[in-house]
From Swiss-Prot:
This is Large ribosomal subunit protein uL29. Keywords: Ribonucleoprotein, Ribosomal protein. One of its GO terms (molecular function) is structural constituent of ribosome. Belongs to the universal ribosomal protein uL29 family. Coiled coil: none annotated. Pfam families: Ribosomal_L29. GO terms for cellular component: cytosolic large ribosomal subunit. GO terms for biological process: translation.
């Protein structure tokens, strides 16, 4: 998800999306530890998206 797309969302939607991504990140880390994760780049992408969303929220002053 691009930063411009994130900026178009309202704060509640961003917070909900962060919660979804954190759950996905938990599952990806578990799969990675077990050795079942095929797309390891997805870990980095999810973490980066969460960071972008948190940055946009802090820019808004919330």
């Amino acid at each position: 998800m691009k930063a411009a797309d994130i900026r178009n969302l309202d704060s509640n939607q961003i917070h909900n999306k962060i919660a979804e991504l954190k759950a996905e990140l938990f599952n990806l880390r578990f799969q990675h530890a077990v050795g079942q994760l095929e797309n390891t780049a997805r870990l980095r992408t999810v973490k980066k998206t969460i960071a972008q969303m948190k940055t946009i929220i802090s820019e808004r002053g919330e």
